[in-house]
Amino acid sequence: MTKNEHVNVKLDRDIQCAVLTVSDTRTPETDKGGNLAKELLSEINVEIKPEHYAIVKDDKQAITEQLQQWLAEDVDVIITTGGTGIAQRDVTIEAVTPLLSKEIEGFGELFRYLSYAEDVGTRALLSRAVAGTVGEQLIFSVPGSTGAVKLAMNKLIKPELNHLIHELTK
C-alpha cells in the first residue's frame, strides 16, 4: 500500500466503538471527556450505542470487568478516559495493560509529545496514556480532561482509526 492508500483506507462495515469513563465523581451529565469522545467519533460517522457507554469508579476490577464485557461483544474499539495519571486512585493503565496482546507504543509516545508541545507543557510527563490490541480489537486509554481527549481523538485516533482496524483484520 502506498502512503495515500494507508491514509484513505475505507472499511466495508461500520465501526463498533465503546467509551468508558473512569472516575469517582463523573455522571453522564458531568462527563465532559467521555461525551467529547462520543461527539468527536460521531464526526467520522461512528455512533456509540447506549450500552457501549459507561462510567465506572477508579477501581481496577470494575474497569477490567467492563472492558472484558465489551471485548466479548466484539466491539472494535474501546476508548477509556480518565485514570491515566500517577495518583494512587489512577488504575486504568493497570487494568488495561494485562488485557493487551500488543501495545502500540507509538500512541503513548506521540500523545505525550503532542501534549507537551500543544497542550500542557511539562505536565505531559505525568500521562501514562496507552493503546494496544486485544486480538482484532483496539483499546485507547487517555486522560479524562477535554484537552487530552480532543488532542488524542483529533491528532491520533480519528486519522488512523480505519487504517488500524484494516491492519488488525486483514
Curated annotation (Swiss-Prot):
The keyword Zinc-finger does not apply. GO terms for biological process: Mo-molybdopterin cofactor biosynthetic process. GO terms for cellular component: cytosol. The keyword Lipid metabolism does not apply. SUPFAM superfamilies: Molybdenum cofactor biosynthesis proteins. Pathway: Cofactor biosynthesis; molybdopterin biosynthesis. InterPro entries: MoaB, MoaB/Mog-like_dom_sf, MoaB/Mog_dom, MoCF_biosynth_CS. Keywords: Molybdenum cofactor biosynthesis. Gene3D superfamilies: MoaB/Mog-like domain. Pfam families: MoCF_biosynth. NCBIfam families: molyb_syn. Belongs to the MoaB/Mog family. May be involved in the biosynthesis of molybdopterin. This is Molybdenum cofactor biosynthesis protein B. It comes from Staphylococcus carnosus (strain TM300).
